[in-house]
Amino acid sequence: MIDATHTANVLVQALPYIQRFAGRSVLVKLGGAALDAELDRALAQDVLLLRSVGMRVVLVHGGGPQVDDMMRRLGMKPEFRDGLRVTTAETLEVVRMVLVGKINRDLVGTINREAAEEPVAVGVSGEDGGLLTVTPRESSLGFVGDVSMVRASVLDRLLDEGLTPVVSTIGADEGGQPYNVNADEAARAIAVAMGAEKIVYLTAAPGLLEDPADEDSLIHRLTSAELYEKIEHQSVSRGMIPKLRACAEAVDAGVGTAHIIDGRVPHALLIELLTDEGIGTMIRREKNW
């Protein structure tokens, strides 16, 4: 009886959030460091539940550690410059193979196996339908591009058909040449183009920490201005800066809220979006909690 009462209380707490976000777009970015078979299954269940209550969920994934692993298995050495992967033509082929041919297919398969009836997830590369048009970064990085345009209608049409897009972040220039795109930046660009209500980054950290060495120092809420100040004063871990900057830019460009949560915690997405306390860090443009 106690368990049943607790379950009822959880559902009652979730109801206002379900009503508020029904019909709204939610962009979920899954980092390569948070990819794990059991966690992917829990994430699939979360995505399906959010979809079932009317949210329009788009999943964007990275895969850096998996690309590194494949490169080493092929006798190649990963190279980075200012946190970005130097992407030669040979490296680009490995990136496409891992992101599009392996991780994307695995995530789509996991979601569809968890679906109660017919499959609902569909894999999409940024190359498909001109979803991500990119311009090259500096030539020393090779085939690394910045998103210059998002054709959000590609995703909107899939969502309108009741499908859940799973996006791998390979884009192409206007001539059709593929480029490697930073997944955090691609997720931000897609969320802004879609007019998303929320963008959620699932990471291998609890969220933004006041003290990077203390996982109990989680910052639960802050504004984009406060976030920029922390980045400027280098009071955050260096590896989090691209995600933090993407969050601030997203909310400043019209996304309702940005969230950084611990993707290692099963069902972290539901806890963050459908409970009062949440589980990670939430960023808004204005301080109207």
What is the role of each PLM region?
Residues M1-R264, I271-L273, E277, R285-W289:
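Nucleotide/pyrophosphate-binding catalytic subdomain
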Residues G280:
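A residue-level signal for beta-strand positions that form part of recognition/binding surfaces
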